[in-house]
């Protein structure tokens, strides 16, 4: 009886530990919203969206975007 109680308690402890590890490693995938770099799996939060790397458009891209919005 004592062995059964100990093994059941051990199994429940392992299940609780695995659930805790699953909750603490949760991170946001690429393309989803974020509030800081630590929320993202790849640790890059650009403009409140998880990205593989931040893209900073150059002058030419900004100018083309400006003319598209004027039409």
Curated annotation (Swiss-Prot):
GO cellular component, one term: extracellular region
MF GO annotations: toxin activity
Entry's localization field: Secreted
Source taxon at top rank: Eukaryota
Keywords: Amidation, Cleavage on pair of basic residues, Disulfide bond, Neurotoxin, Secreted, Signal, Toxin
Residue ranges annotated as propeptide in the record: 61-71
One Pfam family, short name: Conotoxin_I2
Disulfide bridge partners, by residue number: 27-41, 34-46, 40-50, 45-54
Signal sequence coordinates: 1-26
Tissue: Expressed by the venom duct.
Proline amide carried by residues: 57
UniProt cross-references to InterPro entries, sorted A to Z: Conotoxin-I_CS, Conotoxin_I2
Other comment: The mature protein is identical to the Conus imperialis toxin AC A0A125S9E2.
Family: Belongs to the conotoxin I2 superfamily.
Domain notes: The cysteine framework is XI (C-C-CC-CC-C-C).
Its job: Probable neurotoxin.
Name by which UniProt lists this protein: Conotoxin Lt11.3
Organism from which the protein derives: Conus litteratus (Lettered cone)
């Amino acid at each position: 009886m004592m062995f059964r109680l100990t093994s059941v308690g051990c199994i429940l402890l392992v299940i609780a530990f695995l659930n805790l590890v699953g909750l603490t490693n949760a991170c946001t995938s690429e393309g989803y919203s974020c509030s800081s770099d630590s929320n993202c799996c790849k640790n890059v939060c650009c403009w409140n969206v998880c990205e593989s790397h931040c893209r900073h458009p150059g002058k030419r891209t900004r100018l083309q975007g400006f003319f598209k919005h004027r039409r």
